[in-house]
Amino acid sequence: MEIVRVEPTPSPNTMKIVLNEKRKDNKSNTYTTILDNQPKFINDVLAVDGVKSIFYVMDFLAVDKKPKYDWEVLLPKVTATLSDESESIDTPAPDEHFGEVKAEVLQFKGIPYQVKLTSSSEEKRKQLPEVYIDSMLAAQKDDDNIVFQRKWENLGIRYGELDDIMSEVTEEILALYPEKDLNHLVENALNTDVVIPEKKYQHVTLETYQATDDWKERLRMLKAFPTPTERDFPLLGDAVSEEEKTPLRREAIVLLGMIEDKAVLPYLFKGLHDKSPAVRRTAGDCLSDLGFKQALPEMEKALDDPHKIVRWRAAMFIFDEGGPEQLDALRTHENDPAYEVKLQIEMAIARIENGDEALGSVWKQIANRNKS
């Protein structure tokens, strides 16, 4: 058995270790104590001082450490144990998804009733208020099968603590599907054969957007916005400056990230300085997807961000796009207190010092390949 790569996870106490072999029994187990009937390599890792538990599924381990232990000291011992060697991994692989939490909402005939969050190491679910459950059940016909007709709708990637994200996403869903509209959704579901209503896009102007002070109505406008262009900078720039509601600023950043022109950079830079770390990280992700090297100075500044999910994105961007000009900034931050960030900075320094080409993000590499 060999280690393919080590990946950080949104939990500071969990590391994901990808192996070159899959479990033959297709099962999953959590191990907390050494037992004779367990695989030897599991017991060997559990014997490492500081390891709390191991979750083993498919081709990876999620190793949990005790809070007082430092990954910088503990991880080499774990990897050495798995490798049957005294050395850890020579060339760790960059993780394109550090800190990401996938948000989804479960719908039946367009009526939402459950939210699910999934990180690399944890899943969390929450039912919406009872009126949504009742509406979902009321929309069911005699010959309907909820299990087969329900559908998970992807709400995109979020960042932060799962409890905070759950509160934010739930608030968004309640805003997008107000209780006053539920009766109409139920009536429509019962009177038509349409199982999932087609999403309708509607372009709005800055004047229309500003005509309402209701943030929920504004969010519905942004969620229904078609692919934006430079002509939409006034509206989206205003939304990015929204002081009250994080979902509005985040959605505006997501839309701005669709505009593949350098003129969008000042707006995304503003997002990099937002008061919400989730918005800052989203802006960083957009800059990474666009891959404009003009963003390098701003990403160097982001290495000082108070939240590690933002610092990690900055280090990853420099790994993807940076050159010798960024070495001073990287070396200044190479002792970052977050091990995941420190690892990414070390990888960026190594690539640049070795003279390896900056290939850009995986998304950018795919886009360039498709253009050729």
Swiss-Prot record:
GO molecular function per UniProt: oxidoreductase activity
Domain of life from the UniProt record: Bacteria
InterPro entries: ARM-like (IPR011989), ARM-type_fold (IPR016024), Nfu/NifU_N (IPR014824), Nfu/NifU_N_sf (IPR036498), PBS_lyase_HEAT (IPR004155), Virulence_F_dom (IPR025989)
Listed SUPFAM superfamilies: ARM repeat, Hypothetical protein SAV1430
Endpoints of the signal sequence: none
Family designation: Belongs to the CvfC family.
Record's protein name: Conserved virulence factor C
Origin species: Staphylococcus saprophyticus subsp. saprophyticus (strain ATCC 15305 / DSM 20229 / NCIMB 8711 / NCTC 7292 / S-41)
UniProt gene name: cvfC
